[in-house]
Amino acid sequence: MKALRIFCLGGLLLLYAQVGMGQDSIRTEHLQEVKVNARQHRILTSTSPLQLLDKGDMLRLGVTDMADALHRMPGINLRDYGGAGGMKTVAVRGFGAGHTGVSYDGVLLSECQGGEIDVSRYSLDQVQTLRLTIGDNDDIFISARQASVAALLAIETMSEIPIDQQPHLSTQLQVGSFGYVSPYLRYVRRLSDRFTLQAMGEYTYAENDYPFLLHNGKYTTHERRTNSRMNSGHGELNMHWMMGRRADGMSRNQLWAKIYYYDNDRQLPGIVRYYTNVTAEQLHDRNAFAQARWQARSLDDRWMLKVQAKMNWASSAYQDTLVANRRNDATYWQREFYTSAALMWMPDDGWALDYSADWMMNSLNSTLATDLRPHRHGILQSL
């Protein structure tokens, strides 16, 4: 009898469990994995004046070129030498363009002929962040060359890493008055979990034949600007390689490499003359460089090493076919080899010690018979 009661009780419990399972309205759904990919901005704290303008700010403010973006940064004095495709230099608080350094993806740009950097050569469509530092910055992990300038304008290009390994292509076309056309193309692909490739190119063409009124005594004529065509373009090839992973998934060693080429063949309109508008002056500027930057971190995050190397070549050719014997024609060439190493030690939280050493070699020559063809070697150190 006791066994029968136990059997009946077990049957009732089993029946209740089955009824409860049938009446359960809670469903289980498996959510797909979500990946969030974004650029992490460093929290910048500095005892010296610091200005930052990122891609979001540029889109919100509606800036269209590098000059317009630099005008939005307090402390910058932008000098525009005029003309379509003309030279634009930056100075900060009266220091002068020669004392204001401009870095491109962490490596300082150089110009051993005039000493002033033309910022109009760099496309705003490729720029991710503009950062202006006046005086000594709290970031001491920099090259000795960057530490030697009174103010530094850092240009950082777009370096986001796609979450997938599919090709990403973006295009843009700008059209304006007086024959202005500027197409832009950018290609990004993550070839593996550690290697990313990016290529971009842009081309700008403009006739610049804008109209104006010419007053000559009691006569007023409608004229157009002549010999003002601009034909320029530049391309970049960027590579990013992450080597070694830490426990948190971050890369311990990283390598960035860049190949850059710029070409600007433009006509120079000259001054306005009465009774004639014939002029034939031309200026052809070219610039090519290759740079690499390797950064490593120790396992205990106490030591950091950064090594940079760069080869730069530039030429500027002026010609005027209307001058007899072409005696005013001249071509200038400049070359630079540059390398830098920086080692930082962080013995404790809030303490850091950095030593940086740079070596550079510059040469300049031209077609002028009186050219001295100077060469220069330099070593810079900072602690």
Please place each PLM-identified region on the residue numbering.
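Outer-envelope beta-barrel architecture signal
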Residues: 100, 126, 163-169, 174, ...
